[in-house]
């Protein structure tokens, strides 16, 4: 079953799904802007198209991630994104 979600007044849209290869995951697109997300469990974020500037909780330096690159976000934390162009992503929900 697909689960469609919308955040930040429609600037971030995602479709959640579950599959044998990806497990529980979502794919989506973010418009230009700055966003703060909170996680309930650990996540692996892969940039599919575009790029993301990311600041993880506890870090002091922003890091750029381009298409094909991934980063992990701890569970029960926040992370901050700066999006300079429309960017597509895959988010896999990991076991803590």
UniProtKB/Swiss-Prot annotation:
GO MF annotation list: guanosine phosphorylase activity; purine-nucleoside phosphorylase activity; thymidine phosphorylase activity; uridine phosphorylase activity
Cellular component GO terms held in the UniProt record: cytosol
Record key words, sorted: Glycosyltransferase, Transferase
Catalytic reaction list: a purine D-ribonucleoside + phosphate = a purine nucleobase + alpha-D-ribose 1-phosphate; adenosine + phosphate = alpha-D-ribose 1-phosphate + adenine; cytidine + phosphate = cytosine + alpha-D-ribose 1-phosphate; guanosine + phosphate = alpha-D-ribose 1-phosphate + guanine
Cross-referenced InterPro entries: Ppnp, RmlC-like_jellyroll, RmlC_Cupin_sf
CDD domains linked to this entry: cupin_PpnP-like
Highest taxon of source: Bacteria
Keyword Transferase among UniProt keywords: yes
Enzyme Commission code: 2.4.2.1, 2.4.2.2
EC category: transferase
Pfam families: Ppnp
Record-stated family: Belongs to the nucleoside phosphorylase PpnP family.
Function: Catalyzes the phosphorolysis of diverse nucleosides, yielding D-ribose 1-phosphate and the respective free bases. Can use uridine, adenosine, guanosine, cytidine, thymidine, inosine and xanthosine as substrates. Also catalyzes the reverse reactions.
Protein name: Pyrimidine/purine nucleoside phosphorylase
Species assigned in the record: Erwinia tasmaniensis (strain DSM 17950 / CFBP 7177 / CIP 109463 / NCPPB 4357 / Et1/99)
Gene designation per UniProt: ppnP
């Amino acid at each position: 079953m697909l689960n469609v979600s919308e955040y930040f007044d429609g600037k971030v849209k995602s479709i959640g799904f579950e599959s044998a290869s990806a497990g529980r995951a979502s794919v989506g697109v973010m418009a230009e802007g700055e966003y703060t997300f909170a996680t309930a469990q650990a996540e692996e974020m892969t940039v599919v198209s575009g790029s993301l500037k990311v600041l993880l909780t506890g870090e002091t330096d922003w890091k750029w991630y381009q298409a094909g690159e991934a980063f992990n976000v701890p569970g029960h934390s926040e992370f901050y994104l700066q999006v300079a162009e429309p960017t597509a992503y895959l988010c896999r929900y990991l076991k803590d």
